[in-house]
């Protein structure tokens, strides 16, 4: 009616981090989005978020991402990378549970892309000393070892 597209996500029906839904939409392991489109949609989301927060008198989104204190430029991107790690690991676990608990094999091919995207997000975090955490490197090492082992098993078959 008003020529606006609205996306309503009731998957978990609860409030969560501001970055959860955009990460779910743009980095879903079983939906391929080219990087140019993803970047364009992400930029539009960031601008819309800032505009809506200002319009509602909520202040800057960068200040609201974490109530612990003032934020600096790029913090929203850091929170996106952190959310990608959390959301993609959740997705990989969900896909595995669909197979083990329900016998559904249709999501199995999405586990590897989810883990590879998790590795990319961890590398982005580790590439910025202000963003990196000691646990990020350990998690990246474990995931890469798993993916390497998994690839070797597949090649032997």
Q: Each predicted region: which residue ranges?
A:
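All-alpha amphipathic helical-bundle segments outside canonical DNA-binding/catalytic cores
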Residues: 68-84
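Pre-DFG segment of protein kinase catalytic domains
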Residues: 7-9
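ATP/Mg2+ or Mg2+-diphosphate-binding catalytic cores
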Residues: 93-157
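Active-site beta-strand-loop-beta-strand hairpin of nuclease catalytic cores
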Residues: 2-5
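Active-site activation/catalytic loop segments of kinase-like enzymes and analogous catalytic loops
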Residues: 15-62, 82-102, 114-122
């Amino acid at each position: 009616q008003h020529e606006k597209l609205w996306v309503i996500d009731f998957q978990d029906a609860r409030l969560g981090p501001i970055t959860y839904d955009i990460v779910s939409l743009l980095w879903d392991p079983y939906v391929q989005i080219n990087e140019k489109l993803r970047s364009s949609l992400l930029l539009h989301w960031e601008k819309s978020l800032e505009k809506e927060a200002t319009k509602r008198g909520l202040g800057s989104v960068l200040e609201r991402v974490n109530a612990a204190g003032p934020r600096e430029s790029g913090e929203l991107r850091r929170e996106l990378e952190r959310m990608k790690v959390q959301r993609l690991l959740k997705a990989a676990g969900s896909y595995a549970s669909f197979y083990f608990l329900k016998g559904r094999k249709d999501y199995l091919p999405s586990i590897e892309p989810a883990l590879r995207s998790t590795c990319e997000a961890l590398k982005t975090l580790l590439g910025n000393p202000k963003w990196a955490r000691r646990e990020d490197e350990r998690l990246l090492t474990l995931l890469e070892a798993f993916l390497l082992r998994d690839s070797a098993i597949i090649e032997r078959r």
